[in-house]
Swiss-Prot record:
Localization annotation: Host nucleus
Stated family: Belongs to the geminiviridae Rep protein family.
Database matches in Gene3D superfamilies: 3.40.1310.20
Region listing for Binding to RBR1, in residue ranges: 143-153
Name of the protein: Replication-associated protein
SUPFAM superfamilies in the cross-refs: Origin of replication-binding domain, RBD-like
Position of sequence motif RCR-1: 15-18
Organism ancestry: Viruses, Monodnaviria, Shotokuvirae, Cressdnaviricota, Repensiviricetes
Keyword terms: ATP-binding, Covalent protein-DNA linkage, DNA replication, DNA-binding, Endonuclease, Helicase, Host nucleus, Host-virus interaction, Hydrolase, Metal-binding, Multifunctional enzyme, Nuclease, Nucleotide-binding, Nucleotidyltransferase, Transferase
InterPro entries: CRESS_DNA_REP, Gemini_AL1_CLV, Gemini_AL1_REP, Gemini_AL1_REP_central
GO MF terms, alphabetically ordered: ATP binding; DNA binding; endodeoxyribonuclease activity, producing 5'-phosphomonoesters; helicase activity; metal ion binding; nucleotidyltransferase activity; structural molecule activity
Binding residues annotated for ATP, in chain numbering: 222-229
EC number: 2.7.7.-, 3.1.21.-
UniProt free text on domains: There are 3 rolling circle replication (RCR) motifs. RCR-2 is probably involved in metal coordination. RCR-3 is required for phosphodiester bond cleavage for initiation of RCR.
Length: 361
C-alpha cells in the first residue's frame, strides 16, 4: 500500500496532458520511447493542440504490455532539447483506451508509434456506443478503414462476425467495375458478315424500351486473330467473362447492355449458367466462391466467342448425342455464326491491336 499522500497509478493505459509544452510532437515521442520502464511499451499516440491564446499543449496516450505501477510523478517529464526547461504532465490511468485515442486524435495533428492495443473496456465504456462506431465506420470511406474502426471499437463483432462484416462492407463500399475503353472505333470492322450485323442492329439499334424481354444471344466461332473479341467488346458497355465465370460485384455489373463470354469451354458453361446467360434470363442467383449468392439482374444477351475444334467449339459440343436437348434449346435462344476471314481490313489499326489483345482467337 502506498503511503498516504504518495503518488501511485497502476494501469495499462496512461493518458498524459502537458498543458504548456513547446516541444514538438516528434521530440516528445522520441523522449517517451526512450524512457526506461520495466514494462514494455506497445503504443504511443501524441496530439499537439493550440490554446486560444496560441500556446501549444500535448495530449498523449501510452499503452503498456501489462499494468505498470507508476510511483514517480516526474517520470513522464519532457525536457526541452534547446534549454533546461522541464514540462510536467497531468497523469491519469485511462479506463477506455479507445475513448482516449479518439480524444487525442480529434484535431488531426498527431504522431504515433507501435500497434494500438484493443481491450474489452474500450468496446463497452465511455462515450463510444455501437451506433457511434457503426456511423464512424460507414463514414470512413473504405472497407479497410471501416474494418479497422470495428476491430478497435467493437472487437467482439470483429472476432465473431468477421465473415458477415467483410461481405457487408464489400457491398457497401463496392466500386463499379472500370469501363473498358476500346482502342479503336467500331468503324474499323468493315468485313462483318451480314447475319452478325443484323443481330447487332436488331439489339443495339433499338432503345432499351424497344428491346425484347429476353433478347437472342449469338455464338461466334472462328480461328484466332479474326477480330472476334475486339468486335464484341466495342459494341457498348458489357461484362467480359474470359476463361471462366466470375460474378463478383467488383468485376461484374448489372448495369451493362450485354455479356461477352470469351474462351469459356462449353463443358464448363453447361455445368454453370448456360441457359441463364444464353437465354437472357432475368433475376437469377449465382454462388460466389467463399461468398454469399450474388443476385444477377439479367435480361441481356451474351456474345459467346470460341475457336473451332474439340473442347472449344460450341457447335461440335452441341452436335454430340448427349447434348441433343441442350442443342434444341440453344437453337431457339441463340444465333450461330462461323467466320472464315478477319472482321477488319488487313493492315488497319484493328489488325495490329488484335495481335496484342486476342492471342487465343
Amino acid at each position: 500500500m502506498p503511503r498516504k499522500g504518495s503518488f501511485s497509478i497502476k494501469a495499462k493505459n496512461y493518458f498524459l496532458t502537458y498543458p504548456q509544452c513547446s516541444i514538438s510532437k516528434e521530440e516528445a515521442l522520441s523522449q517517451l520511447q526512450n524512457l526506461t520502464i520495466p514494462v514494455n511499451k506497445k503504443f504511443i499516440k501524441i496530439c499537439r493542440e493550440l490554446h486560444e491564446n496560441g500556446e501549444p499543449h500535448l495530449h498523449v496516450l501510452i499503452q503498456f504490455e501489462g499494468k505498470y505501477n507508476c510511483t514517480n510523478n516526474r517520470l513522464f517529464d519532457l525536457v526541452s532539447p534547446t534549454r533546461s526547461t522541464h514540462f510536467h504532465p497531468n497523469i491519469q490511468g485511462a479506463k477506455s483506451s479507445s475513448d482516449v485515442k479518439s480524444y487525442v486524435e480529434k484535431d488531426g495533428d498527431t504522431i504515433e508509434w507501435g500497434l494500438f492495443q484493443i481491450d474489452g473496456r474500450s468496446a463497452r465504456g465511455g462515450q463510444q456506443t455501437v451506433n457511434d462506431a457503426a456511423a464512424e465506420a460507414l463514414n470512413s470511406g473504405t472497407k479497410e478503414a471501416a474494418m479497422k474502426i470495428i476491430k478497435e471499437k467493437l472487437p467482439e463483432k470483429f472476432l465473431f462476425q468477421y465473415h458477415n462484416l467483410s461481405c457487408n462492407l464489400d457491398r457497401i463500399f463496392m466500386k463499379a467495375p472500370e469501363t473498358w475503353a476500346p482502342p479503336f472505333p467500331l468503324s474499323s470492322f468493315t468485313n462483318v458478315p451480314d447475319e452478325m450485323q443484323e443481330w447487332a442492329d436488331g439489339y443495339f439499334g433499338k432503345s432499351s424500351a424497344a428491346r425484347p424481354e429476353r433478347p437472342i444471344s449469338i455464338i461466334i466461332e472462328g480461328d484466332s486473330r479474326r477480330g472476334k473479341t475486339m468486335w464484341a467488346r466495342v459494341l457498348g458497355p458489357h461484362n467480359y467473362l474470359s476463361g471462366h465465370l466470375d460474378f463478383n460485384p467488383r468485376v461484374y455489373s448489372n448495369e451493362v447492355e450485354y455479356n461477352v463470354i470469351d474462351d469459356v469451354a462449353p463443358q464448363y458453361l453447361k455445368l454453370k449458367h448456360w441457359k441463364e446467360l444464353l437465354g437472357a434470363q432475368r433475376d437469377w442467383q449465382s454462388n460466389c466462391k467463399y461468398g454469399k449468392p450474388v443476385q444477377i439482374k439479367g435480361g441481356i444477351p451474351s456474345i459467346v466467342l470460341c475457336n473451332p475444334g474439340e473442347g472449344s467449339s460450341y457447335k461440335a459440343f452441341l452436335d454430340k448425342d448427349e447434348n441433343a436437348s441442350l442443342k434444341n434449346w440453344t437453337l431457339k435462344n441463340a444465333v450461330f455464326i462461323t467466320i472464315t476471314a478477319p472482321l477488319y481490313q488487313e493492315g488497319t489499326q484493328a489488325s495490329k491491336e488484335e495481335g496484342n489483345q486476342e492471342e487465343t482467337h
